[in-house]
Amino acid sequence: MDIIKITSPQAVGSVKLKVTGRPKLILVNGHWNRLLHSFNMSPGKPKYEYWSYFLSYMGAFDAFIETAQAYFGDKNYQGKPFYADGSSLLGGDQSGNDRKIKGYQYAMQNIAEITKGVGNEKIYFISHSEGAAYAAGMAKALIEKGYKVGESVMLSADEGDEFTVEGNYPCYQITAGYIEEEEYLLSYISPIHPSTIKKPKRKFHIDPIVGDHRIQGVNRYGLYISFNTKFETVHGSTINVQIFNILKRLKRLKVIPRKLKGKTEYIIAGGNIIWHKIDNTVVVNKNIDIY
C-alpha cells in the first residue's frame, strides 16, 4: 500500500489529505460480435460480458479474478477490475499495430479514469486475443506517464507478428493448441494392393485464429496443449483459472538440448506433458507424435 500526502495551498500547519493507493487489475477483451453471439460462436458484448462468456459457470469469474490477483503477488487490490475494449470492428479491419496505437491513444485520453486510486502502486494487465495489442499500447502510455506496470499477461494474442512490446515491464504470452488423432499407413505396397494397416498418431494443431507468432519484447512465449478442447473451442480455452498455474510453470521451466542419433532435440528439465514450444524452440512432448 502506498500513502500519498497531499498538502493544499490553503492548508494551515500540518493539515494534510492522505490518499491511499491500491494496485489495479485491467482486463482488455478481444473481438466480440453480436451476430456470431446469437449462434454461440463469440462473446456478444465487451468488458465484463466478454470475460464472463468464457467463465460462464457459477463463481468462475470471481475465481478467475482472485487467482489472477494471487498470481501477480500484490495485496489490497482495488475492489473491481478496470475494463478496456480492445476489439476491432470487423475482426479483420485493423492490424495488431493499429490496435496498439488505439490502446495508446485511449490510455492517454483517459489516464485519470484508468489510474484512479492507484497512487504509486502497480497496474496489472490480462488481455485476450485482439486485446493483447491494445493492452500493449495502454501499458506504453501508462509508463510514459510515470505509472508502474507490474506485469502483463497476453492470452491467445492475435496478430503477434504485427506489434511489439517495449520490454520495460514483465510480459508473458501464452497460446493454446489441441491434439487430434490421425490415421497413418504403416506401409504401402501398390495402388492395386494398398496397405490396410493403419495406426493413429497424435498431431498438434495450434489455435487456428491466432497461429504461432511470438511477440517481440515479451519475456517468454509458451505454446501448450489444452486438453479436452478442439478446433472450435481452443481459442477461448486460455481464459480459465488454471492458466495461472501454467504461467507459473512457463516462468520457471528450463529448456535443455540433448543429442539423439546424431541430432539435437530440446527437452524440458523434469519432464514435459503440456508444452509444444517455448519461445522459438519446439520441445519433445510424449503426448505428440507429429509436430
For each predicted feature, which ranges?
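A short beta-strand micro-motif common to beta-rich folds, especially ectodomain repeats
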Residues: M1-I4
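Serine-dependent carboxylesterase/thioesterase catalytic core
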Residues: L25, N29-W32, G96-P208, Q216, ...
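Extended low-polarity, hydrophobic cluster-rich segments
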Residues: R22-P23, F54-A63, Y134-A136, A141, ...
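Long, low-complexity ectodomains and other extracytoplasmic segments of secretory-pathway proteins
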Residues: P9-V19
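Active-site catalytic motif of lipid deacylating hydrolases and related acyltransferases
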Residues: K18-N120
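C-terminal catalytic-base region of ester-bond hydrolases, centering on the histidine
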Residues: L89-L90, V165-Y291
